[in-house]
Amino acid sequence: MFIESFRVESPHVRYGPMEIESEYRYDTTELVHEGKDGASRWVVRPKSVKYNFRTRTAVPKLGVMLVGWGGNNGSTLTAGVIANREGISWATKDKVQQANYYGSLTQASTIRVGSYNGEEIYAPFKSLLPMVNPDDIVFGGWDISNMNLADSMTRAKVLDIDLQKQLRPYMESMVPLPGIYDPDFIAANQGSRANSVIKGTKKEQVEQIIKDIREFKEKNKVDKIVVLWTANTERYSNVCAGLNDTMENLLASVDKNEAEVSPSTLYAIACVMEGVPFINGSPQNTFVPGLIDLAIKNNCLIGGDDFKSGQTKMKSVLVDFLVGAGIKPTSIVSYNHLGNNDGMNLSAPQAFRSKEISKSNVVDDMVSSNAILYEPGEHPDHVVVIKYVPYVGDSKRAMDEYTSEIFMGGKNTIVLHNTCEDSLLAAPIILDLVLLAELSTRIQLKAEGEDKFHSFHPVATILSYLTKAPLVPPGTPVVNALAKQRAMLENIMRACVGLAPENNMILEYK
């Protein structure tokens, strides 16, 4: 059964005029390695910690500024939100299609809230806590091309022509602000697009981005802004002592106009200095140590890296299943070809290397979780190939072969073919990232023994479900298994309204 909304009634939750306050018992374990009489053993001790959560319920008017607004992702997301807001329908070869938010965790998925008369009851994910309605988002952003969003949508060839015709009047006046362009960080083939760029030194470019954010906020009368990078994949930046290893060195490098400070890092610096959440949707190392240091010092949310939309999402599910079933993946070969501008940029070896690292690391935590299958240091052979084939456009083809060892020396091979409509998969993920980032800024918590409420750590692990290479605070384990990531996100939101985590025990029926 499906219900649209619900309210929690419990002595552990209070709905106030401005906040939801909850008291939550976090049950976990602590491990101790004991030595006694010349022998050692591991001891697992159950542990319960009381947390208090406080969530502001006033939903702000949200502005979203996209770096690379005129690209396939930016134009597709903007078009999709307008189509939903205006209730647009259009003819396809199969039917009359209504605008929707399919593919969005927050807008199109559900959570289990309990059972009633022997039937499980589900509610929208977005009903857990007050969230921004995506129809109300005000979009803006930057691009190195001055093409308006209507023409960008036409160039992208993602949406049906009938829909494009209806959306054009809404999008013709949307023109990106000039963007930061550094040909050393992206493929040379992107130079033909770069007709709208911010001139000056790196310090002047940061100052211009800050000015743009302030003017956008004032012009559109928005309460909050989230900035997200959906521009070209950059090459990796060198991380060096004295260059970008600390906050002070990174800011000094900007002042000295050091060539190795990337455009994406400049945008991130501007956002952090302005107190605006910044999310990196590409695989490059935007968040160099000095930038993470800066975000922590300023308590400003940062998240990334790289949208998890198609092939990698499947991989994070399948490898988790195999290892969890006691099956040993020994070879993972992933081949992709695509024909959009992302594919064109990735044809440059340095840009591809960023993507290869992002896509290859996704199985690491699953492999390390099972020492029965894998010796220390052992890892499946893992190869990722991406080729540019202009004809297929945005319809990326992903082919994977998984070879595994099974019972008594047997071999098992799984082969997948996945046609990933690249931008149509990425757009709702971008939507979820900005909505959850905004929500995160309204949640505070404190553990038993702490005097004051505080926000989540600025490095937003809560966004991990949506990214290929989750950014985590120093010393925090990286989790890539998709089911664990979703459970973490859902259970934190449940805790904010005093609900127990969904553990699927269903003891009442046992």
Swiss-Prot record:
May I have one GO cellular component term? nucleus
Q: One GO molecular function term?
A: inositol-3-phosphate synthase activity
Q: Which InterPro entries match?
A: Myo-inos-1-P_Synthase, Myo-inos-1-P_Synthase_GAPDH, NAD(P)-bd_dom_sf
Q: What is its main location?
A: cytoplasm
Q: Which UniProt keywords apply?
A: Cytoplasm, Inositol biosynthesis, Isomerase, Lipid biosynthesis, Lipid metabolism, NAD, Nucleus, Phospholipid biosynthesis, Phospholipid metabolism
* Subcellular location(s) per record: Cytoplasm, Cytosol; Nucleus
What SUPFAM superfamilies has UniProt attached to this entry? Glyceraldehyde-3-phosphate dehydrogenase-like, C-terminal domain, NAD(P)-binding Rossmann-fold domains
Q: Does Disulfide bond appear among the keywords? A: no
Where, by residue number, does NAD(+) bind? 70-73, 143, 180, 190, 193, 230-233, 281-282, 306, 309, 340-342, 355, 393-394, 422-423
Specify the signal sequence span: none
Per its UniProt entry, what is the enzyme's top EC class, as one word?
Answer: isomerase
Q: What pathway is this protein a component of?
A: Polyol metabolism; myo-inositol biosynthesis; myo-inositol from D-glucose 6-phosphate: step 1/2
Cofactor(s) the record lists: NAD(+)
Q: Which Pfam families match?
A: Inos-1-P_synth, NAD_binding_5
Task: Spell out the protein name for this chain.
Answer: Inositol-3-phosphate synthase
Organism equals: Zea mays
